[in-house]
Design a protein with these regions (language model features):
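Conserved phosphate/anionic-ligand binding catalytic regions in large, soluble enzymes, centered on
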Residues: 83
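Surface-exposed patches in mature extracellular/periplasmic domains of secreted proteins
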Residues: 52-56, 106-115, 268-273
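Metallocarboxypeptidase
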Residues: 54, 184-329
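Conserved beta-strand elements of the Class I
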Residues: 75-77, 293
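Positively charged N-terminal leader segments that act as targeting/secretion signals
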Residues: 2-12
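Short glycine- and acidic-rich boundary segments immediately preceding or forming the N-terminal edge
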Residues: 15-60
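Short beta-strand-to-loop junctions in surface cap/lid or active-site-entrance loops
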Residues: 66-73
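Active-site/substrate-binding loop(s) of hydrolase catalytic cores
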Residues: 73, 88, 95-97, 101-242, ...
Length: 329
């Protein structure tokens, strides 16, 4: 029998008061593709109004999944973990969906907004882990001594200045997925080749052609199918929001970006020239002429420690809610 004040009692009370022990989304351990898959399926089972589908599987068989909530006319897409060592953005998206779903089920609020109003107004499509192969390498789910680890290490040996595996951003074929989109891809190739990234490796290799990787093809196809009003592409780090495509500014994008900056405390900034080509946000703005944002969450050196998650979530919750609703007219 538990006595008042014991550790067991405190743990039980924590469960009964819906603390972190009851949460489906783990925010205390590194994210892996298997944990992401398990989490999404548990969320869909717990909240039947959530939907999921597999967009593709990677060259090594890992699924790239969506997780969707809402039935509103305004469609938005939030993506995360385009880069392997930026995996902390995956639980950011998953936790947001979990808290929104719980608030919908309990007729509650999220960030001061009635949750049911959010899902009536918007349909929020998310791709929580664009690069599951790379994430598994960085987080240790691909163990030393395995064929996949050895193959990645051989590619990494071409770039000895990049720490392995923590410096890995690419997929396991050594292609940087956020340099795969047809928005100045040839210019991106020129820039990255001039920097020495001429062959597959841990980061910054653009591939042999735009959209020639399963993951980037799947996200581009999905985006064209959904035809969203807005996209958020989550990366780390720097506490910066990038909002335009070179000199082109989508009407209304700055005002919404300024609101994101106000809510998060992040800086709204122009994308540095050498990083202005072939990214997902760049392609979306070029093709759709609608607001797209790359958000560099958190601060420090990638991969960011999981201990930084509470701050990242707190800073970005307002962005995630506001992007779904847009600015008041």
């Amino acid at each position: 029998m538990l006595r008042k004040g014991t550790a067991q009692t405190r743990a039980l009370l924590h469960i009964l008061t819906r603390g972190d022990i009851l949460a489906i989304v783990r925010t205390d351990v590194p994210m892996t593709s298997a944990l992401c898959e398990e989490t999404i399926l548990k969320l869909v089972d717990t909240y039947p109004f959530l939907r999921t589908e597999v967009l593709t599987t990677t060259a090594f068989g890992r699924p790239v999944r969506t997780l969707t909530i809402g039935e509103g006319d305004r469609k938005v897409i939030y993506s995360a973990a385009h880069h392997a060592n930026e995996w902390i953005t995956t639980p950011l998206i998953l936790k947001f969906i979990e808290e929104l779903a719980e608030a919908v089920q309990n007729q509650g609020r999220l960030y001061g907004v009635k949750a049911r109003n959010i899902v009536r107004a918007a349909t929020i499509y998310t791709v929580p882990m664009v690069d599951p192969d790379g994430v598994d390498l960085v987080t240790g789910a691909i163990e030393t001594g395995t064929l996949q680890y050895a193959a990645a290490q051989r590619l990494s040996d071409n770039y000895p200045q990049i720490p392995f595996p923590e410096g890995w951003k690419a997929n396991l074929l050594g292609v940087d997925l956020n340099l795969q989109y047809p928005a100045g891809w040839l210019r991106a190739r020129e820039i990255k080749f001039s920097q020495g990234y001429t062959r597959p490796g841990p980061r910054d290799y653009v591939g042999r052609a735009p959209l020639n990787q399963r993951e980037s093809i799947a996200l581009a196809d999905f985006t064209q199918e959904i035809d969203p009003a807005l996209v958020l592409a989550y990366h780390t780090q720097g506490k910066v929001i990038y909002w335009q495509l070179q000199d082109y500014a989508v009407p209304g994008a700055r005002a919404l970006g300024e609101e994101f900056a106000r809510l998060s405390g992040y800086e709204l900034a122009d994308t540095p020239y050498e990083s202005s080509f072939a990214g997902y946000k760049d392609w979306f703005i070029q093709k759709f002429r609608r607001p797209g944002y790359t958000i560099e969450a958190g601060s420090g050196q990638n991969p960011l420690p999981i201990e930084q998650f509470p701050e990242i979530y707190r800073d970005n919750l307002g962005i995630l809610v506001t992007a779904a609703l847009g600015l008041p007219r």
